[in-house]
Amino acid sequence: MNRRRLLQGFLGASAMLTVAPALAQTEAPAISKPPEDKPFAEHFVALQLSDSDPKKERLVLSVASNLLKAYGADKVAIEVVAFGPGIDLLRETNEFRSLVDSLVTQGVRFDVCGNTLDTIERETGKRPAIN
């Protein structure tokens, strides 16, 4: 009986000695810095587009536009990430090209998935022209 209590006490103390330093070393989550082009941004939004459906393209552009209106261009950092068939939004020939250009002038960033570009280039032998 005494051995059991001694063993339980030893295991409990060992656990505390192991866990306590780990708890003491955990840091508070890092607060991300605003993008350099939006130093006063208070809101950060990422929108994704993975379809070349015009309805979805218009919806993403509309959401970005509404966010700019709601928060103001200097208070919100918006990034639209296109991958897969969604990269069609950023082609010169896309019907919404003028809307994309307008959002870019208001500070919205548009990024294209590099893996998508690499895959298209590998399959077709030509890298798509994205602006």
Which residues does each predicted region cover?
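Secreted/extracellular ectodomain signature
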Residues: 8, 25-131
